[in-house]
A protein has these predicted regions:
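Phosphate-binding P-loop
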Residues: 1-5
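Hydrophobic anchor at the beta1->P-loop junction of P-loop NTPases
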Residues: 11
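The conserved Walker
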Residues: 15
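Conserved glycine(s) of the Walker
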Residues: 18
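Conserved substrate/cofactor phosphate-moiety recognition/catalytic segment
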Residues: 21-77
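Glycine-rich phosphate-binding loop used to anchor ATP phosphates in small-molecule kinases
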Residues: 61-104
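Conserved phosphate-donor/acceptor-positioning beta-strand/loop module used by diverse small-molecule
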Residues: 103-123
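Small-molecule kinase domains that catalyze NTP-dependent phosphoryl transfer to phosphate-bearing small molecules
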Residues: 128-177
Length: 189
């Protein structure tokens, strides 16, 4: 990628795949601002309150809109960023394509994934231990999550750019330094 061209490093994948941990680490290492749907939504929960899954979904949609607003603000001044979310290609592709057209942004996608049982167990433990903001309503989705995780359709966005796939079944085997090296190499192209 042209070093003068801003880049969005997209960290995506299914729930409980380790996206946010990786995105936060990369943000520190690359010194790129991190725009995270869950972080934005948690700020909204703290200010507007939380009550049920429907409300959480509404704030989730608003959080995605805010992610793209913040992305545009950074791209407007030529800054590269990291975006962290379980992006859904049919909805997200047009938004990222729009940014490409408007700002000539480059993309590096990092797609985190694991097997269905591992993802479900991680999510369940996180929900039971209260590892995330209660506004997410994680306990409320446990009944449907396992069947939803059966959808193994690609999480890779249909946008120009490079894709790095990261197997996260065993977090101890995820080589963050290798991922960082790959990203830096792609940024220098």
């Amino acid at each position: 990628m042209d070093s003068t061209q801003p880049t969005i490093v997209i960290v995506t994948g299914r729930p409980a795949a380790g996206k946010s941990t990786l995105a936060k680490w990369l943000s520190q290492e690359l010194k790129f601002p991190l725009v995270s749907k869950d972080s934005i939504r948690e700020e909204l929960f703290d200010r507007l309150g939380w009550k049920d899954r429907k409300w959480a979904q509404l704030l989730g949609k608003a959080s995605i809109d805010m992610m793209f607003y913040f992305a545009q603000a950074e791209l407007e001044v030529g800054h590269s960023i990291i975006m962290d979310n379980s992006f859904y290609p049919p909805v997200s592709n047009p938004r990222f394509q729009g940014l490409k057209e408007q700002y000539n942004v480059g993309y590096i996608q990092i797609v985190c994934d694991s097997d269905r049982d591992t993802l479900f167990q991680r999510f369940k433990i996180r929900a039971e231990l209260g590892g995330r903001h209660p506004g997410h309503g994680d306990k409320d989705v446990l009944d449907t999550l396992y069947s939803n995780l059966a959808d193994t359709s690609s999480r890779v966005l249909d946008i120009d750019g490079s894709v790095i796939e990261v197997e996260t079944t065993d977090f101890a085997k995820v080589d963050y330094q290798k991922i960082l090296k790959q990203v830096k190499s792609l940024l220098e192209k």
